[in-house]
């Protein structure tokens, strides 16, 4: 199942956290969710050149707090904070409550899966060979400390008539390990031949160390009825069947 489901969705509450944090009753839940989708869509369109990694939304006490993780905070803020003030007003109108916008810088964009996927998409739109773009991104991530990275591109690669998918991997990407910190990103490249999808998985290590806990559970667990050699012991003899 690790290869089928979304890497972030299966780890929510274990190694990953939600991008939206708020509580709502049944009457308000749908409107809150729709507002979050509109805000994210608007911000990604406005900040297409800012390298936005993710957008976190919180709703404390009839207000809204939006945190934008970006590789280029100067593009988001603008001169003397003019651009971010315009964004704040638009977000407040969409959400219907006073909004505050915080900007967080992504210091290593080469280790952010979403930014890596968008970088590969931009290279493909500039007609750079997909294998070169993949290997360049993989090399940069491994050089900066990633334990593993996998890149998958799908579509009409190099203008081929039949669409196909190719992937490249270095290191380990344990998708079945729930405590693994795996960052996932997806982007689309609009080329003259059609849409090319890019998926990126980056493994950064384990979030929790369960080795000691597992050892204690193993020591405290009751043993089965076996002797030291691992045998199951003597079985009760069955009565012999009478010959017909």
From Swiss-Prot:
Gene3D superfamilies named among the record's database cross-references: 3.30.300.20, Ribosomal protein S3, C-terminal domain
Assembly and oligomerization: Part of the 30S ribosomal subunit. Forms a tight complex with proteins S10 and S14.
An example molecular function term from Gene Ontology annotations: rRNA binding
Family annotation (InterPro entries): KH_dom, KH_dom-like_a/b, KH_dom_type_2, KH_sf_prok-type, Ribosomal_S3_C_sf, Ribosomal_uS3_bac-typ, Ribosomal_uS3_C, Ribosomal_uS3_CS
Name of the molecule in the record: Small ribosomal subunit protein uS3
Gene of this entry: rpsC
Biological classification of the source: Bacteria, Pseudomonadati, Pseudomonadota, Gammaproteobacteria, Lysobacterales
UniProt keyword list: Ribonucleoprotein, Ribosomal protein, RNA-binding, rRNA-binding
Annotated GO biological process: translation
